[in-house]
Each structure stands twice: as structure tokens, then as C-alpha cells.
Amino acid sequence: MTKDQKLYKSLIIADLKIASDNYDSADKALRLQAAYHAQQAIEKTIKLKAELCGLNLWGHEIDVLIKKCDDAKIKIDIPKLIRDKADMYTQWEAECRYYPVKVVRKDSIKRAIDTVIKWLHSGNTI
């Protein structure tokens, strides 16, 4: 991994820490920020793993990023939960920052966090 890729990975870890520290907060604004940072961790992990396989991705839509990886036939073992909930996670990117009436379940955020942590440290690419 290059120095820049290691720095990028540190951003993912920071997103996961923010999400982990706040997903079960009594403060709804903090929970929404936790969901946003969980989404960012998903997005950035896809992008980092793809880059390590030679594919440079841009954008925020999780399903589009997954499709680009699939179309390029790169093997980054995107977890089933991420694939199945891609649309929901994509919504977290903007809705959790700008729409305080958005409802996000604590357990959904926690599952996303746990899945990314496991995925980030799996395989031989990271």
C-alpha cells in the first residue's frame, strides 16, 4: 500500500470510530452523523480496495460503485450486507446530514460498522 493509500485507510478508520462512538447515542443528531460516517466508511472501503486492484472509482452511490467493481471483474469480496443494503447506505450519505427527520435504526448502523470493520481487515489487499 502506498503512503497515500495508508492515509486514506486512516480516514476510513476515523469514520468507523466516529460511527462506533455515536450510533447508540440518545442524541438523534449524533446518531444521524454516525450513520453518515458508516456510509463514508463503506464508500471509502470500496474505493480503496478497488484502487488496490487497479480501479479508480469516483462517486457516492454504493450500488454504482459495486456495479463498477463487478463490471471490471475485480475481486474485492464486497459483503452480502453491503450489496443487499446498498441503496439504504447511499441514502445515509446526504439524508443523514441534511434531513433531521430521517429515521435510521441503531442496529442498522451497528451492523454496517461491524461489517466494514471485518471487511476492511479481511483478504490480502489491505
Model-derived features: where do they sit?
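Terminal alpha-helical segments
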Residues: 1-126
